[in-house]
């Protein structure tokens, strides 16, 4: 027979009540998994309890099952875990291994949630820390539950569905230690006149007697209360149920519950005999409530902000509307509002707080890339873009670099969270880095001079700019976390350390950032982990002094084009540029044939594959045609009318000239600067070097392409006819020597052994030296 706990007659103060919800919403559909995880060995008993008869019918099996499951079912195990976690919390509060406190825990199977009610009282808890302790309390409870789940691993490994519940608990525990409860740990609260919520103390014994005790027992969602509760302990008006109850670590048996309730009601918590005023009896001469008091009670308690708070709200709205990020922006755009706020007590501090709130709002809603597009919404990538020109001069594919920058600024490039522009002076590295960060505007800088607080300016920023980066042993460890995008805590001047979330980093330097300097020694121990976190672009070519600065609009145009054309993720970057691994040194660009990186002649636009400039058609139409052939697919330059399409006639007639067997059949191409080529091919490709922008341009492009296609077909037919004529000429029989002689002007004399008659046009021809040599030693006729 179970031990009956003594009736609790005093409860430690102050007392608070908590509610813990089991962080697995589908617990009712998979309750059998909870039996296996928390109460291993009770699965068969729970199945048998489903088929038992309800009270008052006699059922020996039912009574035996209820006795055996008294404190072994999963509700009892959950109740014990919560009690142990509560004891641990109070020991932390009182700094004592054996805290002096009172604890009541009751587990219940609700309609939606599996939850536990906790009443705890004692020194160490107060209105100030009871509410803030919810996350810590939640983490301690989950740790106790996980520890009981691990006991199952001693007998067998987890099933897949059991492992799913276990990992859900582990994830919730990690979030709890980060201060996130997800609404699964709540405390009874009240709202004050200002609308703030505070922890509410309770009368623990009355709360226990009136709310927790009058409930019927139900230890499984498959069974019913009339199966688990005997008729002698049935609460008639109770609609809710409970699973298990612990009072200071001792279980409250089901058969003793009604007795316990009666003892509390009669001996411990008697009702008031007299009213609290005047010694009147109950319901005698109650005070009348006047109209004014009724009117006052119906007045709305909505909080009204004062003048200072209204000014702060207006300034915050202005910052969101006009994208104001620094104090100078406030002075330029809303000086009147700024002056009114400066006139308030502590106005400068209030302005800093408003700007800090706006920075937090921007960092939570935008990434560096999306905020850049938010500030520069409509931009087009032109061929005279200086960012495009600079990357081409340094030997890189500007489209590939833009793709990588989009991934890094959008926090989609994995562990490589940093872009480093390395090179000597006057190569454009600072020009490029400055254009990126000034386009984003909300950026922080690293200060080497303030050695104790190097990253003081990096919190609540979209991007970090590390100009002339130098790695020192004092800050190399936090630098590795920041360069890799790992969350870490940084020291801030005159404040506690703050959490720095993942923030992209832009570096421009001419130092070796992989060599760590410390004192009079240089170490390369950190070189490998630093290289895994950095993408380095080497700028080695010096720029002319007239190159100019890259504007924020130009860098935004390049990144916006890449963001619209490519999949800006790590996987998309690897697939687009055929890379198995992103190296530390960014790969150089490979230009298409005939495409140039010389930005002097850039009117024809840029190639969408290599980023190089298309060459000038006026300089060499042959290369333009070849480049166009690679970019236009099936339409070739010969098909678009580069040649005249006319067959050239031979200089001699068919009688006077016999064509060779291997004669060139195609008509010679027109010269590079011919009018026909300039009108057809070059004009077409100069007009359509980019995609049509709307439906009208698309229809015009299709019309011109169809005309050029028809011209190609007509030219093909002419070439086929020429080929047929030449084939017929080759099939004619070759003339014999006599016929050749007649064609050359020799006529046979008709008299035997007489030389032929030579026409007058050949009479003046003198024999050559070779002919003279043929008659040496012979008598000439």
From Swiss-Prot:
A GO molecular-function descriptor: ATP binding
Effect in UniProt of substituting residue 566 to H: In strain: Eg/BSU-1
Region spans: Transactivation: 606-781
Listed GO CC annotations: host cell nucleus
Disulfide pairings: none
Pfam families: HBoV_NS1-like_N, Parvo_NS1
Spans annotated as Disordered: 621-679, 709-781
UniProt keyword terms in alphabetical order: ATP-binding, Covalent protein-DNA linkage, DNA replication, DNA-binding, Endonuclease, Helicase, Host nucleus, Hydrolase, Magnesium, Metal-binding, Multifunctional enzyme, Nuclease, Nucleotide-binding, Transcription, Transcription regulation, Viral DNA replication
Positions annotated as active site in the UniProt record: 211
Residues the entry annotates as binding a divalent metal cation: 108, 115, 117
Listed cofactors: Mg(2+)
Reactions catalysed, as given in the entry: ATP + H2O = ADP + phosphate + H(+)
Alphabetized InterPro entries for the sequence: BoV_NS1-like_N, Helicase_SF3_DNA-vir, P-loop_NTPase, Parvovirus_NS1_helicase, PV_NS1-NUC
The enzyme's E.C. designation: 3.1.21.-, 3.6.4.12
Positions occupied by motif RCR-3: 211-215
Gene Ontology process terms (BP): DNA replication; viral DNA genome replication
Keyword match Nucleotide-binding: yes
Enzyme class: hydrolase
Motif RCR-2, residue range(s) on this chain: 115-117
Impact after mutating residue 746 to L: In strain: KU3 and Salvator1
SUPFAM superfamilies per the UniProt record, alphabetical: P-loop containing nucleoside triphosphate hydrolases
Subcellular location: Host nucleus
Assembly notes: Homooligomer; when bound to DNA.
Function: Multifunctional protein which displays endonuclease and helicase activities required for initiating and directing viral DNA replication. Also plays a role in viral packaging and transactivation of several promoters. Binds site-specifically to 2-3 approximate tandem copies within the origins of replication (Ori), unwinds this hairpin region and nicks one DNA strand thereby initiating the rolling circle replication (RCR). Becomes covalently attached to the 5' end of the nick and provides a 3'OH for priming DNA synthesis.
Protein name: Initiator protein NS1
Gene: NS1
């Amino acid at each position: 027979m179970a031990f009956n706990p003594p009736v609790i007659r005093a409860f430690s103060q102050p007392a608070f009540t908590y509610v813990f919800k089991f962080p697995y919403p589908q617990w009712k559909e998979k309750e059998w998994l909870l039996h296996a995880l928390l109460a291993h060995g009770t699965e068969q008993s729970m199945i048998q309890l489903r088929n038992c008869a309800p009270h008052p019918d006699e059922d020996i099996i039912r009574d035996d099952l209820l006795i055996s499951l008294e404190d072994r079912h999963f509700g009892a195990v959950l109740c014990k875990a919560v009690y142990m976690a509560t004891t641990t919390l109070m020991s932390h509060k009182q700094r004592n291994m054996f805290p002096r406190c009172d604890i009541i825990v009751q587990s219940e199977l609700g309609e939606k949630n599996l939850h536990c009610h906790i009443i705890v009282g004692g020194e160490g808890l107060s209105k100030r820390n009871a509410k803030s302790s919810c996350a810590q309390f939640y983490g301690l409870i989950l740790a106790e539950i996980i520890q009981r789940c691990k006991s199952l691993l001693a007998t067998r490994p987890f099933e897949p569905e059991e492992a799913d519940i276990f990992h859900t608990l582990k994830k919730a525990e990690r979030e709890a230690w980060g201060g996130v409860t997800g609404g699964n740990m709540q405390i009874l609260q009240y709202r004050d006149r200002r609308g703030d919520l505070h922890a509410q103390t309770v009368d623990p014994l009355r709360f226990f007697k009136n709310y927790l005790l009058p409930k019927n027992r139900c230890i499984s969602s498959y069974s019913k209360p009339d199966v688990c509760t005997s008729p002698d302990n049935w609460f008639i008006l109770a609609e809710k149920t409970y699973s298990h109850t612990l009072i200071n670590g001792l279980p409250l048996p089901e058969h003793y519950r009604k007795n316990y309730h009666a003892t509390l009601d009669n001996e411990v918590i008697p009702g008031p005999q007299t009213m609290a005023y005047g010694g009147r009896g109950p319901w005698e001469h109650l005070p009348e409530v006047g109209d004014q008091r009724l009117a006052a009670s119906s007045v709305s308690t909505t909080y009204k902000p004062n003048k200072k708070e209204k000014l702060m709200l207006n300034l915050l709205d202005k910052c969101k509307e006009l994208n104001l990020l620094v104090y100078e922006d406030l002075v330029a755009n809303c000086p009147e509002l700024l002056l009114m706020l400066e006139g308030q007590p502590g106005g400068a501090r209030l302005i800093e707080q408003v700007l800090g709130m706006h920075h937090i709002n921007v960092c939570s809603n935008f990434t560096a890339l999306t905020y850049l597009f938010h500030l520069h919404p409509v931009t087009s990538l032109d061929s005279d873009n200086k960012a495009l020109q600079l990357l081409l001069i340094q030997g890189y594919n500007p489209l590939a670099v833009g793709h990588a920058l989009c991934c890094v600024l959008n926090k989609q490039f994995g562990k490589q969270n940093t872009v480093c522009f390395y090179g000597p002076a006057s190569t454009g590295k600072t020009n490029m880095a400055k254009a990126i960060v000034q386009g984003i505007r909300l950026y922080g800088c690293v200060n080497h001079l303030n050695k104790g607080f190097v990253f003081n300016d990096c919190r609540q920023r979209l991007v970090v700019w590390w100009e002339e980066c130098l790695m020192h042993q004092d800050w190399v460890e936090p630098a590795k976390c920041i360069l890799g995008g790992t969350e870490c805590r940084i020291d801030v001047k005159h404040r506690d350390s703050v959490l720095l979330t993942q923030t992209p980093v832009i570096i421009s330097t001419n130092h070796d950032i992989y060599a760590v300097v410390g004192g009079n020694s240089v170490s390369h121990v950190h070189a490998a982990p630093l290289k895994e976190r950095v993408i380095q672009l080497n700028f080695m070519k010096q720029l002319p002094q007239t190159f100019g600065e890259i504007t924020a609009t130009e860098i935004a145009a390049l990144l916006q084009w890449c963001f619209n054309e490519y999949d800006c993720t790590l996987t998309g970057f690897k697939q687009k540029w055929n890379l198995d691994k992103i190296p530390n040194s960014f790969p150089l660009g490979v230009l298409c044939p005939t495409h140039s990186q010389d930005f002097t002649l850039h009117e024809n636009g840029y190639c969408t594959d290599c980023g190089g400039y298309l060459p000038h058609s006026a300089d060499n139409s042959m290369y333009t045609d070849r480049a166009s052939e690679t970019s236009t697919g099936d339409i070739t330059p010969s098909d678009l009318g580069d040649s005249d399409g006319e067959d050239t006639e031979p200089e001699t007639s068919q009688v006077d000239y016999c064509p060779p067997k291997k004669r060139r059949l195609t008509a010679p191409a027109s010269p590079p600067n011919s009018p026909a080529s300039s009108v057809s091919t070059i004009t077409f490709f100069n007009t359509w070097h980019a995609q049509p922008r709307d439906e009208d341009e698309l229809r015009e492009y299709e019309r011109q392409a169809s005309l050029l296609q028809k011209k190609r077909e007509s030219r093909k037919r002419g070439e086929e006819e020429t080929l047929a004529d030449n084939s017929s000429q080759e099939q004619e029989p070759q003339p014999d020597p006599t016929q050749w002689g007649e064609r050359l002007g020799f006529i046979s004399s008709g008299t035997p052994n007489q030389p032929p008659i030579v026409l007058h046009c050949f009479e003046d021809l003198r024999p050559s030296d070779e002919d003279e040599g043929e008659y040496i030693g012979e008598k000439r006729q």
